[in-house]
């Protein structure tokens, strides 16, 4: 069944507009509670319980209350963790033996957006089929459990501390971060009170920015999607490197001491090449957006590479299908299944630092064999219901570009899973040609939209 509300990363939208309204989110909580508990087959007498975490958006208070009401009506107890990174919810759901976890966040989006995403009892994002089942229940009348079976809610005070220790446990015992000065940008998001403690407790000198959330400033000129802020912090403070997370803490971008920015492909290469050298890497999963240079660099090391659809959920699915442990996206979602069940910005940063420490290398030295092809990405806004695949002009322009590039590049057109955008990506060895072809395709899309 096709999903109406769920995108590549849960249900997301502008606050106050469907589906991110209090009424809809309450119905979503009820539908999810009924669906997820029914799939768990609890022993008789055991009460179902679900964890709710959120980022620092002001709308999180409203949506948390709405979700809580929906779960309570379904007879589900709720544990409220407060502001906490998305991967922390995945970990705590599993560690506390709960039936599911829920995150209220729109990740890297502005404060006026928000979203809801779910984790299974095992700490993994829900399969498409389960999300479709939840959607089907949303369309049915909302019920209410008997009074004696209504859900209860309580706050858990040690969520942050538990997660800090979990993150630190992913870093090798024989290593520490003493002598390292790290600039850390938490995007005024969910990791603001957690990430600085992780790196400090491992011995680093931490220069923190983006750690003063006010409900409105999440991702505003800071974080993994705005790495220039981190770059300036690294250069002005003479840091050895910089680490940027996004609003919900599952995305990672880094900066070296010279101010060069390292995206997800480069950081994944650092982790993968270190593990390949240790003989503990079977293969790497990237996405359709992963740079060809990244794929070729892995091939030179004899490392198998496969491309999943864009979205960390699809990277995770392919990792499980192939029995591999490492994968990610150039956007900074990196998954290390030998450390966590989902992508985690803090843990991914620790894996990069461990690789550099073990090999006694800097970021630039670890990436010296990695030569990226120029890649141009242009986002074109699409009106609701516009069928770009059926437009002959768009198809012809894209086909012409592919013929021009031949075996030296790629063309990719794909709709965003979270916004009304068509992403036009062109990649090749000649930067000027790549730019020209990308602009040509984007122009064809704009003309088609204009009619």
Swiss-Prot record:
**HAMAP family assigned to the protein according to its UniProt record, in alphabetical order:** GlmM_B
- Active site, renumbered: 107 (phosphoserine intermediate)
Name the top EC class.
Answer: isomerase
State the reactions this protein catalyses. Answer: alpha-D-glucosamine 1-phosphate = D-glucosamine 6-phosphate
Q: What's the protein name?
A: Phosphoglucosamine mutase
What gene name is listed for this protein? glmM
Task: Cite the source lineage.
Answer: Bacteria, Pseudomonadati, Pseudomonadota, Betaproteobacteria, Rhodocyclales
**Required cofactors, per record?**
Mg(2+)
Organism equals: Azoarcus sp. (strain BH72)
Please give the residue positions where the record annotates the modification Phosphoserine: 107
Record PTM = Activated by phosphorylation.
Similarity field? Belongs to the phosphohexose mutase family.
Q: Which Gene3D superfamilies match?
A: Alpha-D-Glucose-1,6-Bisphosphate, subunit A, domain 3 (3.40.120.10), Alpha-D-phosphohexomutase, C-terminal domain (3.30.310.50)
